[in-house]
Amino acid sequence: MKNIRNFSIIAHIDHGKSTLSDRLIQTCGGLSDREMEAQVLDSMDLERERGITIKAQSVTLDYKAKDGETYQLNFIDTPGHVDFSYEVSRSLAACEGALLVVDAGQGVEAQTLANCYTAIEMNLEVVPVLNKIDLPAADPERVAEEIEDIVGIDAMEAVRCSAKTGLGIEEVLEEIVHKIPAPEGDPNAPLQALIIDSWFDNYLGVVSLVRVKNGMLKKGDKIKVMSTGQAYNVDRLGIFTPKQVDRTELTTGEVGWVVCAIKDILGAPVGDTLTHQHNPATAALPGFKKVKPQVYAGLFPVSSDDYEAFRDALGKLSLNDASLFYEPETSSALGFGFRCGFLGLLHMEIIQERLEREYDLDLITTAPTVVYEVELTNGEVVYVDSPSKLPPLNNIGDIREPIAECNMLVPQEYLGNVITLCVEKRGVQTNMVYHGNQIALTYDIPMGEVVLDFFDRLKSTSRGYASLDYSFKRFQSANMVRVDIMINGDRVDALALIVHKDNAVYRGRELVEKMKELIPRQQFDIAIQAAIGNQVIARSTVKQLRKNVLAKCYGGDVSRKKKLLQKQKEGKKRMKQLGNVEVPQEAFLAILHVGKD
């Protein structure tokens, strides 16, 4: 056990976590050179295309150190994007140490900080590593000072390496062996194993990634899941060397996978504890804090026949992704679907793309909203995650919107642009600290403004140099109203949005103009209106298509022409009473882009 090291890698997006993990695997001979490919651990197609890590993955490597001993390194790769920070905290719970990878050219960024603080709170040993020192722009001295200044850990001794060329990888491995403590735990105590992650395999059922804290887990053991009390037989277990390798047992301190033929998707929840059925542990291990979704959106299948398949797909995805929340919802415009909760817009895009790719579904998404706290006139408090659930105006005493605390690291020359952006988003500055050329800004910004397009705008105003980390802080009173979109006098529930009163007229007018371009012309006029309650704030009309009924009258009497025109007019009138307007898919997506350009 003293030769086991459990660690994960934390870093900002694009600072080279996945490339470094490739080199570690190659150096320790986890895969032969023939099987090696770039970003081995990013196994999802989506991860490769976007170049980001979404799911945490684990690998067990054997490393023969310079002191002659062979160490077992259990290494868990973590995502760097702010939307996936819950994946990071899960990975860290299974480790004793973390490598803090910082790009020697770019220096410390906001996510590096956030993830690093998470690690320090969990009492992990943080080992700084300066990556990409082969780049001409690398300045390891300055970055080492930055780490000490901003993060506050000793970095003068930090290992310098280049994951791309393989320089300094041996030194990184030696640091891991010497600095990160061995796992603690009692091999003879009753079994306690923490479920770090679960996913669904069509042949094996639920596969769980576990970290054994105490005791031993053997093939053929009878185990039970502590939260549900269900008992299972261990059919197979083993480790990843990235390839799945079977073993007969997992001992204290090891990380590996377990298959117990669990058919039910909710059979092995993430963060739960496994123990023996006959000799159970007295208490469960502390799990992870439940993540609350920050953004809600309705997802509806384009054809209603796909509803069942859609429900099953969501079930399988939610097993793999603990932070996905969903409940059934019906809409008069779109039929049956689900209201889903996500951690952020990137998370929402990825889930939608995974549903469309892996499960072959066609989906319509409604505009994302955040959760509002609404106090009714009778003193009752309700939480509203969709505009259609907002109570009537005369029943509402107070609407409180969620405020996010945003920590940004901004280079000095872009400070003005970023402050302008924050003010435009109704932000309030709470702190500002200078660290050399970088400035740490803290703003309280309404969550609704942050989740829509704040991240993209922040990147574009600062040419990609500013970085952001945000977390929910509190609810605060605000003058929010619901803007309804009406087409020919009928409210379309899927197009409603909750906005601040100051922006309502502007957003309403913009949305109405956009809808005018997207709704195809019919044989009659279509009136598109935006309204708050009964007050219409914007309107535009899609003009009718009109057939020239006088084409065949050459000369002749004017009363003949009048008769034909009158007949056409009556026909149009009747058509308008009966006619239905098809709202195309693009119109629902238009809401997302309102206020961007």
Swiss-Prot record:
SUPFAM superfamilies: EF-G C-terminal domain-like, P-loop containing nucleoside triphosphate hydrolases. GTP binds at residues 14-19, 131-134. GO terms for molecular function: GTP binding; GTPase activity; guanosine tetraphosphate binding; ribosome binding; translation elongation factor activity. Keywords: Cell inner membrane, Cell membrane, GTP-binding, Hydrolase, Membrane, Nucleotide-binding, Protein biosynthesis. Its EC number is 3.6.5.n1. It is a peripheral membrane protein. GO terms for cellular component: plasma membrane. The keyword Cell membrane applies. GO terms for biological process: positive regulation of translation. Its main location: membrane. It is found in: Cell inner membrane. InterPro entries: EF-4, EFG_III/V, EFG_V-like, EFTu-like_2, G_TR_CS, LepA_C_sf, LepA_CTD, LepA_IV. Residues 2-184 form the tr-type G domain. It catalyses: GTP + H2O = GDP + phosphate + H(+). The keyword Glycoprotein does not apply. It comes from the Bacteria. Pfam families: EFG_C, GTP_EFTU, GTP_EFTU_D2, LepA_C. Belongs to the TRAFAC class translation factor GTPase superfamily. Classic translation factor GTPase family. LepA subfamily. Required for accurate and efficient protein synthesis under certain stress conditions. May act as a fidelity factor of the translation reaction, by catalyzing a one-codon backward translocation of tRNAs on improperly translocated ribosomes. Back-translocation proceeds from a post-translocation (POST) complex to a pre-translocation (PRE) complex, thus giving elongation factor G a second chance to translocate the tRNAs correctly. Binds to ribosomes in a GTP-dependent manner. PANTHER family: TRANSLATION FACTOR GUF1 HOMOLOG, CHLOROPLASTIC, TRANSLATION FACTOR GUF1-RELATED. This is Elongation factor 4. The gene is lepA.
